[in-house]
Amino acid sequence: MKNNLRYGIRKHKLGAASVFLGTMIVVGMGQDKEAAASEQKTTTVEENGNSATENKVNETQTTTTNVNTIDETQSYSATATEQPSNATQVTTEEAPKAVQAPQTAQPANLETVKEEVVKEEAKPQVKETTQSQDNSGDQRQVDLTPKKATQNQVAETQVEVAQPRTASESKPRVTRSADVVEAKEASDEKVETGTDVTSKVTVESGSIEAPQGNKVEPHAGQRVVLKYKLKFADGLKRGDYFDFTLSNNVNTYGVSTARKVPEIKNGSVVMATGEILGNGNIRYTFTNEIEHKVEVTANLEINLFIDPKTVQSNGEQKITSKLNGEETEKTIPVVYNPGVSNSYTNVNGSIETFNKESNKFTHIAYIKPMNGNQSNTVSVTGTLTEGSNLAGGQPTVKVYEYLGKKDELPQSVYANTSDTNKFKDVTKEMNGKLSVQDNGSYSLNLDKLDKTYVIHYTGEYLQGSDQVNFRTELYGYPERAYKSYYVYGGYRLTWDNGLVLYSNKADGNGKNGQIIQNNDFEYKEDTAKGTMSGQYDAKQIIETEENQDNTPLDIDYHTAIDGEGGYVDGYIETIEETDSSAIDIDYHTAVDSEAGHVGGYTESSEESNPIDFEESTHENSKHHADVVEYEEDTNPGGGQVTTESNLVEFDEESTKGIVTGAVSDHTTIEDTKEYTTESNLIELVDELPEEHGQAQGPIEEITENNHHISHSGLGTENGHGNYGVIEEIEENSHVDIKSELGYEGGQNSGNQSFEEDTEEDKPKYEQGGNIVDIDFDSVPQIQGQNNGNQSFEEDTEKDKPKYEQGGNIIDIDFDSVPQIHGFNKHTEIIEEDTNKDKPNYQFGGHNSVDFEEDTLPKVSGQNEGQQTIEEDTTPPTPPTPEVPSEPETPTPPTPEVPSEPETPTPPTPEVPSEPETPTPPTPEVPAEPGKPVPPAKEEPKKPSKPVEQGKVVTPVIEINEKVKAVAPTKKAQSKKSELPETGGEESTNKGMLFGGLFSILGLALLRRNKKNNKA
């Protein structure tokens, strides 16, 4: 019996061995068939977009996964641009190497969305990680928390590595959330700027006047005054501004280096500040005091000085000012002072600039011979007779020879010494002749005065001086016409240029008269609009009295000449700062005593004027539940202010006076001093509602440090007041006024929160649906309805398309895209890329499909879980003999009518998936590369890439928690193939065929042996 058994085994050995060997060949060749292609030709794809790197998230429960072993043999010029799932580790190297995946998926619970820009460096490995990887482009990492999958769901993990891209092809396309937040914070921190309200300004009246008469003498300190009466529209806010433009022959600063214009004030409260913009443009900007003011008017007066650079000679000048299209003009003669002269020489001078901050000034002196006469042994000196700084440094003196004609020298005493055609610097030639001293003086000695010279002086004056006077003096001897024993006597010419600084409130006698600069401001308070009722029993009136001291300033002025002859006409240069200090008003509201109010007035006598006060009034309790306190900067009411100022002081906000004298041979002095007066009348109209009440207590006056605070209280019931006359006298009156009035306000029923996204390039989605962004080759198209929540991640570039309706918007980049019909009952996580160069196809109704390639096979079925779609452009492993699978036959390109191919099944027969098993290829229908094969069914299908006979093209669908979508941009495509076209796969198929035949042969032998054995 043992022999029979041994014989039986030996007899069946050939057949069993054949079956075993054939099965091993089939299985082995099937497992290794994917590694055949990569060494001949790779896919050529021109792409402009970035590849997105995704961090896949597996199911929260551990599932058994069937992972095909992938041998990556492609050569990469850059790092792989996809980050695989947690269950797979992909190593890309130059040589082929297998990648083994574990059998269990790891859970993930990441909830944040991270978008990071990574370095453009190439690294040979891409490993599974939750942190950023160094890629050849911008990395986009999406971590979302998935929902728990059903127990019957099997996750198929198939790793795909995108086509490599070089770093130069990478372009940013994702706006990070941090950038959005920073942009929003920047917009929140944006400072609100005002608007130009020039068009809302009405010029009720405008004029340009010459206070000194029908002409202007700039060297005598004369100027013109621009007067405006303006009316503004309601609704002005802080920061709003209006502009007006002056002609170029005037300026607002004279010789002062301070470039500013007076403020518009309401009492001591600044309502608008002025600034010089250049080119004659003046701008006034309103402060926050303008808020809630209506019926705003302003009286503006600005001093205008003749510009010596523009107006260099005597003559008529047209002075203009334009505001809101309305031009105010005046034509007036300009007359300059010729200086002091005799028959031989002329001396003239002018202070060019004056800087109070640095205590410096500049002076220009003309020294020129007259009538062709020359002088010998001439000495010119410059000295500070008043305001000399003995401890100061040496002045800077430059001597220039005038090369032009004498009559062309500017009468305005202006010298553009940088013009070398007219001015030659001869300071170095005066070595030994020019000397300077520490006290600010200089002396220049000339052997002969036969040329015209211009002397430019820069020096200091003593800080704190109330007067500055610079004297230019010339000593000389006329040239003798005939040589004789008679000696001609010498002569002396003296010219003074002085500055007298005094308070704007001063007034003085002089031929120049008054210089007035007023800025009155009127308005009505709008803070209680629509909330108060009643009226005052008597109209409130403001009374302002100005008692100004007319005592002229005491100015020491000296001129001296030689008794031989000639005369001197000297003057003091005047400087005035253009700021106007408005008169502040202290008032007390005096209304009819029959209504129970205070009768009387408050009188304040002061030397300097900022006055504020406090006033407390209670409104009728019938109309208000409570009293609301607020500060009011207006000055309603009546009162009396006596202002006295007779002090000479150096102040930034000050004007200047003039002293002009003429000395004849009899040494008589004419004193023609000029002073300026600031007279600012503020008229306030403040109509407030009726008040009835009774005084509850006395008025308390507290005077400390020259600061007066006046409190008054009015009751809420009718009655008679016990107030009397209140008098307050202080040295430096600074009265704070506080008015407490009630008002009605609204109420917010709840908190309101507003959030705004300022991104302009975001797409607009009006309805939901599935927006699928797919990067790879074989990607199913999903249609149907979603019962779960959709999460969208979008790109905020400007090139995004606009989706008007929902449905399924699918962005597809590659060739073979199957189509899946059914319903999705769970959450789909969709990532979208909307590059500018993608075409858009609309397939009826709500399903917009955006794709770029040829074939779109169609797969029908229904998915009950969350779908994660991954595609591999290489055919999968054929199933084991128990569950044979037949790859789908490629079809010719007919993109107009999509077809519905059968759903492919996963390669593991133990855990079958819902899609139907594809049929194996039919060897009877050969297909040459590049030629389409007739379709297996009558209805046309989406175009697919032609393959060789025996090649398996099977879309692989992995059911996971996330739709994997990386959509690289393709701008231009020429003839390109998706997979390498090599013969490796054909040889693999032949090997599999050989193995199969070997197995069949073995089975046949076994069957034959069995029959023979029975026989």
From Swiss-Prot:
Region (Ligand-binding A region): 37-512
Chain span(s) of sequence motif LPXTG sorting signal: 979-983
Primary localisation category: secreted
Extent of Polar residues compositional bias: 75-92, 129-139, 780-791
Residue stretches of biased makeup (Pro residues): 875-935
GO biological process: cell adhesion
Region 5 X tandem repeats, Pro-rich (WR), residue ranges: 876-945
Modified residues (Pentaglycyl murein peptidoglycan amidated threonine): T982
Annotated D- repeat ranges: 746-783, 784-821, 822-860, 861-875
Matches recorded under InterPro entries: Adhesin_Fg-bd_dom_2, Adhesion_dom_sf, Fibrogen-bd_dom1, Fibron_repeat-bd, LPXTG_anchor, SDR_Ig, YSIRK_signal_dom
PROSITE patterns hit by this protein: GRAM_POS_ANCHORING
Region of interest (Disordered), residue spans: 75-199, 596-623, 741-815, 828-953, 966-992
Cellular localisation: Secreted, Cell wall
Region of interest (Fibronectin-binding), ranges: 513-873
Extent of motif YSIRK-G/S signaling motif: 7-18
GO cellular component terms, semicolon-separated: extracellular region
Membrane topology term: Peptidoglycan-anchor
Region (2 X approximate tandem repeats): 546-605
Start-end of Basic and acidic residues biased regions: 112-126, 179-193, 828-839
Residues in WR repeats: 876-889, 890-903, 904-917, 918-931, 932-945
Chain positions covered by the region annotation 4 X approximate tandem repeats: 746-875
B- repeat ranges, renumbered to this chain: 546-575, 576-605
Function description: Promotes bacterial attachment to multiple substrates, such as fibronectin (Fn), fibrinogen (Fg), elastin peptides and tropoelastin. This confers to S.aureus the ability to invade endothelial cells. Promotes adherence to and aggregation of activated platelets.
The protein, known as: Fibronectin-binding protein A
Originating gene: fnbA
